[in-house]
Amino acid sequence: MKNNNVYILEDRGLLYINGDDSKKFLQNIITNDINKVSESSSCFSALLTPQGKYLYDFIISKHKSGYFLDCEKENIENLCKQLNIYKLRSKVEILNLSNEFVVAALSREKYLNIDGSKDLEGYTSKFRDDTILLDPRNKELGARLIINLEKLYLSLKKLELKTEKIENYYDLSHKLGIVQK
């Protein structure tokens, strides 16, 4: 991945889980420990059926009083429905923010030049109030910037990044053994 390239991951969507019971709700249904997720740490997790069969995977990061779930956009409606089935009487709100936020991938080297970054998988910090994290699956995949669409191009300009074809990102991902599509 070239240092000044950015990949706009248009095939990724974002759910936002918020509410008094959001942490407990997620802890009871995902495959990873939600206690690992904080303002400075994100994790990769999945949702399984009650029989243990794979349904969806996602990257979870803390955002304000809730959690972002970064997942495949084509599955987002089904994931949202599934989460609402498990919701029952939990005090949680599940919002699809895919039309308001976008996920962009940038190189690990560029990420490490940003103030407050650390070379740890899943390390999470802020860039201009937006979440930026080193990919928790493999840090060679670079960092993910979860940013409001309105601020996207201004932030890319500030970081001196130019957009690149998404296929190059997926080629790297496949070489690292992380199949995304």
Segments predicted by a language model, with ranges:
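Basic, glycine/lysine-rich polyanion-binding surfaces/domains
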Residues: 1-181
